Amino acid sequence: MSEPLNLHRLTTESRNSQTVEIHKANTLGILKMINNEDMKVAAAVQEVLPDIKTAVDCAYESFQNGGRLIYTGAGTSGRLGVMDAVECPPTYSVSPDQVIGIMAGGPEAFLQAAEGIEDSEEAGAEDLRNIQLTSNDTVIAIAASGRTPYAAGALRYARKVGAHTIALTCNENSAISKDADHSIEVVVGPEAITGSTRMKAATAHKMILNMISTAVMVKIGKVYENLMVDVNVSNKKLKERAISIIQSLTNASYDTARYTLEQADHHVKTAIVMLKTSTDQKQAQTLLDEANGFIDKAIEHYHP
């Protein structure tokens, strides 16, 4: 006979005293109760900023050593990792292999729940084995409960390989935190609907993943001022955004910005350096290469 999981001991599974009569509320009352709970999320995230910093530093070190940032999780947790990972290539022109989201059950589970797989530690390890995990990588295992076997298996395997390991959960002193080098335990309190961790827990985790990937991209030079200067110009909307970015940083006219972007092979950074230094595409690209992709350093290094 299997032992009970004792989920009632977890904060994420506790009943919320503020919403016990949500079933009696009218539509606006229901929404107010949910909104009141959601307002607690940002404050909870603020409490764990030092732990988030550690995760950013690990990912940055991995990138510097040719490694990757890998999110892994089951159910909603896995979907959050995939969502963050797939936005990095269009936003920052990084390779799809640099930030990876792995979900228990594979891509099919994103659209149709495959809940049973979360109980397999071996599946968590196997999915990392399949992408040839190395000691240069950073693995962030996401599990609101902090006890999901799939996440635990992933962390244990990653630790054995020598990768940086981080547990992201919503319960203090969680089981998977013991399997990781570092942990981010963002305690958002009981959910408006008991145990529905797709609500506050998922919101907190989405915020944290946004912060981690964004901060790392800033640190590797993908952002100048507060503009996404490495945006992948892959459609009309992004081309217009790229032109606007170039105009904002160089005071060029629309036509000049568009022409220079085209001359720069639609590489925004190169176009900016071309206009800032009055160089051609080849010279500007060389300056950027010598500056490891940082626009300000490329401009500083230029000597006419």
From Swiss-Prot:
In terms of InterPro entries, this protein maps to: Etherase_MurQ, Glucokinase_regulatory_CS, MURQ/GCKR, SIS_dom, SIS_dom_sf
Query: What Gene3D superfamilies does the record tag this protein with?
Result: 1.10.8.1080, Glucose-6-phosphate isomerase like protein, domain 1
Tell me its EC number(s), please: 4.2.1.126
Return the SUPFAM superfamilies for the record: SIS domain
Report which residue ranges the record marks as coiled coil: none
Task: Please give the biological process terms from Gene Ontology that the record holds.
Answer: amino sugar catabolic process; N-acetylmuramic acid catabolic process; peptidoglycan turnover
Q: Any extra remark in the record? A: A lyase-type mechanism (elimination/hydration) is suggested for the cleavage of the lactyl ether bond of MurNAc 6-phosphate, with the formation of an alpha,beta-unsaturated aldehyde intermediate with (E)-stereochemistry, followed by the syn addition of water to give product.
Q: Which family is annotated? A: Belongs to the GCKR-like family. MurNAc-6-P etherase subfamily.
The name on file for this protein is: N-acetylmuramic acid 6-phosphate etherase
The species is Bacillus subtilis (strain 168)
